[in-house]
Amino acid sequence: MEWKDRIVATPDTLFGKPRIKDTRISVELLMDRLADGWSMDDIVVAYPHITRDDIQAALAFVAEIYREESFVAVGKAGHDQTAA
């Protein structure tokens, strides 16, 4: 799946946050829903303007961002007490 066909970010919509093309549904909102335990089907029912492919594109976008970033938000992540 090529996320670049479905994920856009423009400064005049949602303060430039990445979102599903032709919607105001942000990648952040989708990640929050998934983290809260919503299924893809739950999301599609709640937000009928998006598809499962849109959600997959959002996941692919986030995965690529994390692969390319050279840092981790250590302050937000838990601490591994077993690390030597």
Locations of regions flagged by a protein language model:
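C-terminal structural segments of small proteins and small subunits
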Residues: R52-K76, A83
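Basic, low-complexity segments
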Residues: M1-F15
